């Protein structure tokens, strides 16, 4: 029996696969244009690509931007994509961790304002550097604001105090 499958085509990519890969490079280039300058500095990019990414913000017309992003995609072909993806994953991971910590602090604030002395005791156990008197005062003000349906200025102060304690405990301050 003769097999019609030809082994010569195993290594070649189809036109569709090539287009998918190029489109993925353009999308990665689009993502890079949204990053801040200090974040871009951490990425292993060529000077030509850095210049093209900087110029991308100047192209506002749809056609010009699309054409320029195709150029960025072309420049992306010679980049170390694994290194770029690794740095972007690290950035995403640290951003996720920051957001999770931020939401945890918001939950603490809400429990302290809505809660009782048990919640305050748990908080003080977790954050031993807490100035109880100051925190109780902030909580009391926030509770009064909440009862009177006023804007949450005191609740913001409670959050800021909690965030400062957290940053001090983590050595970020």
From Swiss-Prot:
Key word RNA-binding present: yes
The UniProt record lists the keyword Calcium: no
InterPro entries with a match to the protein in the record: DarP, DarP_sf
GO molecular function: ribosome binding; rRNA binding
Pfam annotation, one family: DarP
Function of the molecule: Member of a network of 50S ribosomal subunit biogenesis factors which assembles along the 30S-50S interface, preventing incorrect 23S rRNA structures from forming. Promotes peptidyl transferase center (PTC) maturation.
Name listed for the protein in its UniProt record: Dual-action ribosomal maturation protein DarP
Annotated organism of origin: Pseudomonas entomophila (strain L48)
């Amino acid at each position: 029996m003769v097999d019609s499958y030809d082994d010569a085509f195993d290594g070649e990519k189809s036109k569709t696969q090539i287009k998918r890969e190029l489109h993925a490079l353009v999308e990665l280039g689009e993502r890079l244009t949204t990053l801040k300058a200090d974040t871009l500095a951490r990425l292993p990019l060529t000077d030509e690509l850095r210049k093209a990414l900087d110029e991308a913000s100047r192209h506002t017309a749809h056609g010009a931007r699309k054409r320029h992003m195709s150029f960025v995609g072309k420049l992306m072909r010679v980049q170390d994509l694994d290194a770029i993806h690794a740095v972007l994953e690290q950035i995403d991971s640290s951003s996720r961790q920051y957001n999770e910590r931020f939401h945890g602090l918001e939950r603490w604030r809400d429990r302290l304002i809505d809660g009782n002395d048990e919640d305050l005791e748990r908080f003080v156990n977790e954050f031993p550097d807490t100035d109880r008197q100051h925190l109780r005062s902030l909580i009391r003000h926030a509770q009064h604001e909440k009862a009177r349906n006023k804007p949450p200025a005191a609740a913001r102060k409670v959050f800021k105090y909690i965030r400062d304690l957290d940053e001090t405990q983590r050595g970020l301050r």
